[in-house]
Amino acid sequence: MGQTIKEIKARLAELTDLSAKEFLEFETDERAGVQAALKSRKKQILAECAEDERLEQMLEFEKELYSQEIELIAGIDEVGRGALAGPVVTAAVILPKNCKIRGLNDSKKVPKSKHHAILSEIQEKALAIGIGIVDAEKIDEVNIYEATKIAMIQAVSKLSLKPEHLLIDAMVLDLPIAQTKIIHGDARSASIAAASIVAKVTRDEMMKDFALEFPEYDFEHNAGYGTAKHLAALTKYGITRIHRKSYEPIKSMVNFKY
């Protein structure tokens, strides 16, 4: 007696190589359910191969360092530089050698619905994670560029392991640690992408808490960025203690307070 469609689907799920002999065998099965299952599994395998290749490319900078016997590599990224309200948050993440996390990318390119699942895997696999936070008051005092550097140095200082090398998204830090500045690093380095996700989720959770304190500004949805609803609330209610007074239109509203 031949295999049932259910049995064939179960076997297909185990296959990861399109050249497997089972594919040729099942292609001779004329049942529509079998052909649909074949087509679906082939599509999945192609997608998995493409993802593996993408993740391999995201280890390019790390592999160059591995070849020099450098393994404690911290990726560093920030979130919140362009927001009108809330802190700038940074993260430093040291991943184990050749670590691949499916779906990992620049947080801006990852669907929000997947952030927490990817964060959980980062937390499970990472050798060390550090987070830096600089509030709006400090941002106004020193400017956002300097505040971001302060937050990044904070993040590095909070790592439980001392990194041998830093991979940083478009920054150079005043630290006695070898470092590489990578433009668009959060989409090109797995370590930086991991830091991007950690910083993003951390900041989003903070903004949800601020939304409870200041419900009129829709912080739980806009994360402090200048959406129409946020700007309308500024016009109606004024600025709060977490707004950046060095940013326009806040700068022109400093006497109109919540």
UniProtKB/Swiss-Prot annotation:
Broad enzyme group: hydrolase
GO function terms (MF aspect): manganese ion binding; RNA binding; RNA-DNA hybrid ribonuclease activity
Superkingdom in the source lineage: Bacteria
Reaction(s) the record says it catalyses: Endonucleolytic cleavage to 5'-phosphomonoester
Binding site for a divalent metal cation: 77-78, 169
GO biological process: DNA replication, removal of RNA primer; mismatch repair
Main location as per UniProt: cytoplasm
GO CC list: cytoplasm; ribonuclease H2 complex
Protein keywords: Cytoplasm, Endonuclease, Hydrolase, Manganese, Metal-binding, Nuclease
Residue ranges crossing the lipid bilayer per the database entry: none
PANTHER family in alphabetical order: RIBONUCLEASE H2 SUBUNIT A (PTHR10954), RIBONUCLEASE HII (PTHR10954:SF18)
Family to which the UniProt record says this protein belongs: Belongs to the RNase HII family.
Function: Endonuclease that specifically degrades the RNA of RNA-DNA hybrids.
NCBIfam families: PRK00015.1-1, PRK00015.1-3
Name by which UniProt lists this protein: Ribonuclease HII
Species, as recorded: Lactococcus lactis subsp. cremoris (strain SK11)
